[in-house]
């Protein structure tokens, strides 16, 4: 949906302007969400080419060629608007990626539902790796700077992006935040996206990898319900493993569902609270960062 309607304005901590303001000295020049809002409203007619009634009574609004329904917009118009928005975002993402590669910054985009334990995972990681890896963080939420404050309590540098009515970060926002945060060369940058398993899947931020965090309290079928996110990710972290003795949750079934969506997906089971399984994540982090550094040097 965000790829066709756009999202609300955003604010980066310490700034009074809106992201995309031409007055900012950032290397990104155009406002990200300045796409055409001519929604081709119909004159009372009601098209049915974008949804399907299944035999079980459910209604599917993903059966049109655009894969999504927007009132008053034809499927062809939806596709065009989506292309316009994503092409702008991809250009900003490519610029971010080039910057990260020049600086040797290893950027990860953490995505999940609200309450999966992303922030707790980052806090634990920063504390445990403080003598092994320099880490800075970009936090994304609709409102408050609570998560950035939690990160700063670890001693790490963090900046908060508030997206307002927007439900995901985009590459333009991240580019501004990176300019202000200025991650150290050779460091890791953790980008904690807005809690949402839908919209962030389509938006490349320039990261090396998307990491999807799934709490064991969410259900084994979550990868099948929200396939785009799991298809876009390189690593799935099953968090809150300390709760498994108290839940009717089949870890193997959940992983199998995720691999049905994305056969190349790597998976880890951890508890950010107790530390169980975290060393495996740290090993993945260090190996992935080293591989990325080698590829950057070769390129």
Curated annotation (Swiss-Prot):
Positions of the UniProt region annotated as Disordered: 18-57
Annotated GO MF terms: GTP binding; GTPase activity; nickel cation binding; zinc ion binding
List of residues binding Ni(2+) 2: 167-168, 199
Region called G-domain, residue ranges: 107-268
Binding site for Ni(2+) 1: 2, 5, 7
One GO BP annotation of this record: protein maturation
Keywords assigned: GTP-binding, Hydrolase, Metal-binding, Nickel, Nucleotide-binding, Zinc
Gene3D superfamilies: P-loop containing nucleotide triphosphate hydrolases
Basic and acidic residues composition-biased segments: 31-57
Null mutant phenotype: Insertion mutant lacks any hydrogenase activity in symbiosis with peas, but is still able to synthesize the polypeptide for the hydrogenase large subunit.
Domain notes: A histidine-rich region at the N-terminus is proposed to play a role in nickel binding, both in solution and in chelated form.
Family the UniProt entry places it in: Belongs to the SIMIBI class G3E GTPase family. HypB/HupM subfamily.
Role: Involved in the maturation of [NiFe] hydrogenases. Required for nickel insertion into the metal center of the hydrogenase. Exhibits a low intrinsic GTPase activity, which is essential for nickel insertion. Is able to bind 4 nickel ions per subunit. Can also bind zinc.
Protein name as annotated: Hydrogenase maturation factor HypB
Lineage: Bacteria, Pseudomonadati, Pseudomonadota, Alphaproteobacteria, Hyphomicrobiales
């Amino acid at each position: 949906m965000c790829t066709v309607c756009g999202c609300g304005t955003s604010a980066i901590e310490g700034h009074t302007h809106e992201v995309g303001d031409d007055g900012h000295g950032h290397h990104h020049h155009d406002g990200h969400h300045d796409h055409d809002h001519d929604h081709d409203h119909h004159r009372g007619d009601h098209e049915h080419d974008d949804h399907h009634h299944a035999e079980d009574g459910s209604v599917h609004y993903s059966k049109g060629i655009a894969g999504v329904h927007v009132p008053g917009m034809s499927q062809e118009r939806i596709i065009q608007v989506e292309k316009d928005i994503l092409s702008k975002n991809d250009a900003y993402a490519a610029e971010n990626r080039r910057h990260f590669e020049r600086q040797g910054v290893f950027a990860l985009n953490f995505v999940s539902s609200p309450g999966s334990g992303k922030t707790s995972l980052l806090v634990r990681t920063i504390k445990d790796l403080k003598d092994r890896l320099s880490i800075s963080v970009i936090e994304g939420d609709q409102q408050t700077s609570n998560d950035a404050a939690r990160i700063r309590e670890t001693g790490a540098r963090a900046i908060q992006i508030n997206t307002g009515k927007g439900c995901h970060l985009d590459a333009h926002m991240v580019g501004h935040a990176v300019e202000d945060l200025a991650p150290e060369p050779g460091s890791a940058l953790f980008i904690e996206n807005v809690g949402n398993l839908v919209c962030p899947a389509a938006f490349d931020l320039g990261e090396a990898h998307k990491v999807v965090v799934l709490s064991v309290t969410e259900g084994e079928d979550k990868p099948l319900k929200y396939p785009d996110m799991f298809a876009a990710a390189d690593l799935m972290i099953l968090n809150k493993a300390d709760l498994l003795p108290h839940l009717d949750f089949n870890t193997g079934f959940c992983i199998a569902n995720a691999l049905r969506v994305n056969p190349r997906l790597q998976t880890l089971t951890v508890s950010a609270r107790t530390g169980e399984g975290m060393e495996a994540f740290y090993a993945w982090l260090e190996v992935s960062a080293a591989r990325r550094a080698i590829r950057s040097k070769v390129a």
